[in-house]
Amino acid sequence: DSSASYGHQVYLEIIGLVNNRLHDAKRVVTGKMKTMKEDADRLEDRLKDVKTFSAKVVPAGTWCARVCYEDVPDLKECLKLVDSVNGFEAAAKKFLVVTNPMAIGPKEVHRKVEDGMLKELSYSSSSAIHRAMGYIPNLMGTEVTAYPLAGNVYVVTQGELGKSKTTFGIGNGGMYKDTIAALTERECHQALKAVRKIADIMESRNAKNGLFGYSGIYQEAEKIKDKMYKVDRDEISEVKRAYKNVIKLEDAVTTALDRVADGLLAWVKATIKANE
């Protein structure tokens, strides 16, 4: 019947979306992970040659936005993002399990889990909504929440309960002047450790048959194939919305991690140069 045909169509659309992301992520990330770790090792060696860490500031550059949180350079939030990714991934997995067509219940359940997933990473604030409006077009209405991430990335949900749409925007500027604070020796080591961890996270999230990331979404999507023929159109549409949202969230987190890694490497490099 038409519902079964629509279910199959939506299933193919979801699988296609995830497959494209997985393919792109593997192509881009594989080469970049190696470079990330090599750059971190190289800078670690250079740190050994720095006699004193007396510099208080470093010249600002375009890289500064990549270490910003709500437009302000913030090492603490960069490190926090790296440490909170596992919690986000576990919540994302739970979200997809709840979204399984055979387990579809009241829409409130979905929104609660969806919100919980975002809260693993950040919290919504009026200032984040205000800033996100500058980065995401056509963002208006009362049902808007914005979650800032390190890397100056903003995850936004828009729409009423059970019909929300997730998107994200990037701020390529920030509230800093010609200089920003230099890192201490300890902070340099923390930053490089975080970069290596990001490389490992990227690898595990995009590994074949991985539990999390795009690979994890693909695994869950495969499980719903047969069930998509047995639910009505409204439920199928809800599944489609949920998967599109969780893919957007993965896009946002991947973007934030990538930006933070680049920014941290540049920050350490600038600190070393300022102390030479």
Question: Residue locations for each model-derived region?
Answer:
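Extended amphipathic alpha-helical scaffold segments
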Residues: 6-37
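Non-catalytic, low-structured ubiquitin/UBL-interacting segments
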Residues: 1-4
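Long, low-complexity or tandemly repetitive, helically biased scaffold regions used
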Residues: 41-276
